[in-house]
Amino acid sequence: MVTVEEVRKAQRAEGPATILAIGTVTPANCVNQSTYPDYYFRITNSEHKTELKERFQRMCDKSMITKRYMHLTEEILKENPSFCEYMAPSLDARQDIAVVEVPKLGKEAAQSAIKEWGQPKSKITHVVFCTTSGVDMPGADYQLTKLLGLRPSVKRLMMYQQGCFAGGTVLRLAKDLAENNKGARVLIVCSEITVVTFRGPSETHLDSLVGQALFGDGAAAVIVGADPTPAEKPLFQLVSAAQNLAPDSCGAIDGHLREVGLTFHLLKDVPSVVSNNIEKCLFEAFNPLGISDWNSVFWIAHPGGPAILDQVEDKLGLKPEKLRATRHVLSEYGNMSSACVLFILDEMRKASSNAGLGTTGEGLEWGVLFGFGPGLTIETVVLHSVPIKPGPH
């Protein structure tokens, strides 16, 4: 007779969950941040609000963003004038776009990750799909499974309305799934489009305007599994994962799904809340490893905005190069909510390889990935890099 303990042991993987492939994609429509205020105030019929436009121009100039990608083209916005008002009922039209385009963009990212992984998609055992862009039943996880032609027995998990911390959440969940199910291969997809949040300017709600200056569209996919086979190419190991609510931060970041779409609210002191709580999260994550020098690890932080990065850098005494990959993704894509940290992982491993560094983590062994979002919620993932094998010359 087999015991429960023996069954459990047989079910578990031997080694830690490992990232085996990463794929990223954006919509084709690219918007230049320097000219975006002119476009935004024209398309929303708000050019008469000259003072507000000047304010928005300053927000865009200070955003450290060069360009963003958006599914919403001028043509789509002209077909849906309600999107361009500040508070016009428009949820049906927004949903009609989101329920189709979110899984479609996610599929492109997933195909890219599967191609890099190099294994048959029939080996995917679990799907975790994450989006803050629209809700539906059956969800985007179901649509993705159909679009990719995955097995009907694939185990799906759908995460809606988590916000900007969720890139850390999906890695935490994938870690648990991979390590507790021997042979599991988990496909994570974060797909975000601003169709639910885009709206015209308001003189009384400047936090909404901040969102219009920062958010962009993108999808990222990651394949996670433990005990890689010789045919698989490990990129990062997921060593530990934690989630914390910052004390006294209620209302710091809120989003509410209404007839007008997803409304976005934030307090001015979000950068302070993050920077005041980050050291405690770092200490709890790295104390077991005997690490207390935050410059000795590689960094992947959700780039909520430049002020958050500046305050974190200042509070922890980080060298400017620590947030290079993070700032690069902010500059090239804007804030893509949950997808951002996965884009940064991709950027880091590619830049590390191109620079001839010894590991996927900028030549360093240990690293941290942070997600920040509504709550205020902080996700902390400890990563272990993988040695880069020199390619053929």
From Swiss-Prot:
Top EC group: transferase
Catalytic reactions of this protein: (E)-4-coumaroyl-CoA + 3 malonyl-CoA + 3 H(+) = 2',4,4',6'-tetrahydroxychalcone + 3 CO2 + 4 CoA
Gene Ontology BP terms: flavonoid biosynthetic process; polyketide biosynthetic process
Active-site residues, Swiss-Prot/TrEMBL: 164
Enzyme Commission number: 2.3.1.74
InterPro entries: Chalcone/stilbene_synt_C, Chalcone/stilbene_synt_N, Chalcone/stilbene_synthase_AS, Polyketide_synthase_type-III, Thiolase-like
Annotated keywords: Acyltransferase, Flavonoid biosynthesis, Transferase
GO molecular function: naringenin-chalcone synthase activity
The UniProt record lists the keyword Acyltransferase: yes
Pathway: Secondary metabolite biosynthesis; flavonoid biosynthesis
Keyword Transmembrane helix: no
Family: Belongs to the thiolase-like superfamily. Chalcone/stilbene synthases family.
Function noted in UniProt: The primary product of this enzyme is 4,2',4',6'-tetrahydroxychalcone (also termed naringenin-chalcone or chalcone) which can under specific conditions spontaneously isomerize into naringenin.
Protein's UniProt name: Chalcone synthase LF4
Native species: Ipomoea batatas (Sweet potato)
Gene: CHS-LF4
